[in-house]
Amino acid sequence: MSYQEIKSIVALVSTLLINGLYGWYVFWRYQQEAPGVAELFRFWAVAMLIFMGVALVAQILITVVFRAAYRRITGETEPSFADELDRTIGLRATRNAYYAFALGLVVALLTQVLSLPPVALFATMFLAGIASEVAQALTQLYYYRRGV
Amino acid sequence: MEKTGKLRIGNQVRKLRFLNGEMTQQQLADKVGVTRQAIVAIEAEKYSPSLELAFRIARAFNTTVEEVFILDETSL
């Protein structure tokens, strides 16, 4: 299995782990605090802003640990640049990530059209974010394995 | 009616590496400016390189693009 394939699997697992744990924590807090309509937007804005920081730090740590583990286990160094194959696959992965997020956004808006509670809007947008990252990692894995 | 499916393009990269002093995939990758994984994908016919990369690979073997890459006529 190539470096890029392993990297895609690590990205997939870490996305599911970080987003899943943080999502679980936020929904647990939401149920504990039960914010009213006035506090609802503030609650989700704070939750999403904190998540951006948490996700950034977690991704940096995972990248550093993954590279160190890859070097130690395989005795090889990771590619230092992205070539035309990486860029082609990267573009397709980004396209699919946008599709997944756009679909999630439409579903999020539909929750309000169907008069579901506001929490459904934020929860769906959060899930759309996870779906887009999963779509990106899966697309990369698929094209690195099957070819372009 | 004209076929619009993907053309199958074979290649002689592995053979040419062997004939050029058993050049490694990494050596070829360094010569043409891509990662070793890209050479692996090209050899396995999982990736058809850009025209620019095809010329660089041919030049690395001191040959022509037609000697390295072969169009499978049955896929036309």
Language-model segment annotations:
Chain A
Residues W28-F41:
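Membrane-interface helix termini and inter-helical loops of multi-pass transporters
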Residues R42-I62, L127-G129:
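Alpha-helical transmembrane segments
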Residues A58-E76:
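Membrane-water interface of transmembrane alpha-helices
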Residues L121-V148:
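Alpha-helical transmembrane segments and their immediate juxtamembrane interface regions
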